[in-house]
């Protein structure tokens, strides 16, 4: 990454992680990061697709899984090894500024696979259902953004 982009990235991280904080977000953000927190939503989504769309719903689920796998592999196997940005909690120059609410993972951190995967789900669902439900666009983007923000927070 270029020097100016790295500086912007660090400054943005410090602002979100250290300054834009609150007791409510301290409670909410770890929940949003927890994959089990979203299990009921995914169960509802899969049930909804199967009940309302039968065989086509199963195909939608299959493509949803493929979209997530593709997004995850793209972020984890292609982008992260080339960008090689350490997680802020593991970066010796940055970790003194990090406020951790959950444990610190290993490996590289850009892009966030959680954020990439959830934005992939949001775009896929919006593509499927926007013509029927216009509200899905702002809701899905807000959902994916909230998860992305919680990864930084």
Predicted regions and their residues:
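N-terminal transmembrane-helix/juxtamembrane module of multi-pass inner/ER membrane proteins
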Residues: 1-42, 75-106
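Membrane-helix interface segments
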Residues: 24, 54-60, 131-136
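Alpha-helical transmembrane segments of integral membrane proteins
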Residues: 29, 59-63, 67, 135-139
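Hydrophobic, aromatic-rich transmembrane alpha-helices
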Residues: 41-52, 118-127
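Interfacial segments of alpha-helical transmembrane regions
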Residues: 46-75
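Transmembrane helix-loop junctions in multipass membrane proteins, especially transporters and channels
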Residues: 54, 84-89, 131, 152
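Juxtamembrane membrane-interface segments at transmembrane alpha-helix termini
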Residues: 71-80, 148-153
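Membrane-embedded catalytic cores of phosphoryl/pyrophosphoryl-handling enzymes
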Residues: 99-153
